[in-house]
Amino acid sequence: MNILTFDVEEWFHLLAFDNTRTEAQWGKYEVRIYENVDRILDILERTNTKATFFIIGWVAKTYPDVVKKIAAKYQIGSHTMNHQLVWQQTPEEFRKDVESSIKLLQDITGQPIECFRAPGFSIRESESWAYDILADLGIKYDCSVFPAHHAHGGMAGFGAPVPSLIKHGDVEMKEFPVTTKTILGKKIVFSGGGYFRLVPYRLLKSWSAECANGYANHMVPRIWHDKAGNVVMGDDGFPVTRNVGYLLSYIHPRDLDGGQPMLEGLPLKRKFKSYVGVKGAAEKLRYYLKDFKFVDVKTAADNICWEKVPVVTI
């Protein structure tokens, strides 16, 4: 079960960088969202691939035509309104931010917004209150868990990086964590962001194939259908399932933009992480989507037997 996601931001939406931290600063930068989104849509069309797009509310407010173009064929999710880290907000601020983004996206697209991803995977164990708010706002699927250490968040103790039910009090949230692979004792997220750009394609393909085939027994209970497409039910009253592997990839439009300007004032390490491999990443994605079949979050969720997935209590 391979899932493709995009975090739709402008090229300057880097987290924890003072020069681009607030909305008041964003208007002075070059607009690249049109060509960057068109590049993605062209690749998806040519490879017949479905994906989920997590869109910042600011992008939707500023460029509603871009959002409408995406929503014509693809699932839309919220990436908050103003791209701020969750752990830097109070619960009240977080609710207001997410609620405004959901309303805006629903008004523009006519779609129910049922999917969410936090900027920088910034829901940690200490921000578990966020799940109460997300559920209250109608979110059914979350893609915010980074099951390793991360500069902006992460849940290193999450458990196996597979679809799970997060339980927080009376709330249950269907969670799609980012895929990880352990290399020399360290968990790395190779299928998205900087690692996607950095890792040579042969290695990316090899690691992805391992995960898609059930790396380290990280499996998903996929619902079994008969030849007519009907769900096959077992004697226990639950759907019959077959365990399959799991791979989730996340890409930003700027990851594929080889012509973007370089932001001034970035530390050397951050500059490397932000721009390494951007010139060849679009071509790499084309190969990736030809070698692996991906679906969007909703399609994946509809094909999982959630009664049989791990339960993670936070």
Task: Pin down the residues of each PLM region.
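Active-site beta->alpha N-cap acidic-glycine motif
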Residues: 1-75
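Conserved, mostly hydrophobic/aromatic
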Residues: 7, 44, 79, 116, ...
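Short acidic/His/Gly/Ser-rich catalytic and metal-binding motifs that mark active-site loops
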Residues: 11-16, 184-186, 257-263
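The substrate-binding groove and active-site-proximal loops of carbohydrate-active enzymes
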Residues: 24-31, 54-56, 82-94, 119-122, ...
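Generic structural signal for well-ordered alpha-helices
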Residues: 37-41, 64-68, 98-102, 131, ...
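C-terminal domain-boundary segment and adjacent tail
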Residues: 46-48, 198-232, 243-314
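Metal-dependent polysaccharide deacetylase catalytic core of the NodB/CE4 family, i.e.
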Residues: 47-127, 139, 144-152, 171-183
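Active-site-adjacent pocket scaffolds in enzyme catalytic domains
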Residues: 111, 118-236, 240-244, 249, ...
